[in-house]
Amino acid sequence: ALKRPIHLALSYDEEVGCLGTQSLINLIKQEIPEPLGVIVGEPTEMRIVTAHKGITHFLTSVYGYEAHSSQQHRGVPAIMYAGRIINWLAERQSKNAEFEDKKSGFEPGYTTLHCGLIKGGTAANICARECTFETDIRTVPGENPEDYLEELQDYIKNTLEPQMKSI
């Protein structure tokens, strides 16, 4: 016989917010003794790990000035500038990959930056007034996501904003 019971708890919707977890945690707190340990099978493919990458999720909104696409020089196309920010994310990730720590236990062994959702524009022939996109940064231990945000803000402030304001 076991001295303490073993409980199996399953949740759902890991990819878009772990919507089932909060109510599950609340129920566990109310109904059973605090667990001595937990096994989480995702995203480790059931391998034992001692650390997990950090996650920073943020929303970026770019505001431009609407113009007809045949008169782009009179507008500030928000989607095009958002694309340059997204390209910065990709270039920064490539830079990280050059210094991958293959012994880190992470796959990949470097911090990743990713844009997973983008919205903007009203028509194909209009320079968009607004573009919004969502990004996540998965940092390896020892790296601070704030450092990436500061680099990105510096790029926006010193490179993109002057170009956008010159029109």
Model-assigned labels for residue ranges:
Residues A1-H57:
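Acidic/histidine-rich catalytic neighborhood of metal-dependent amide-processing enzymes
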Residues L59-I167:
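Metal-dependent amide/peptide-bond hydrolase catalytic core
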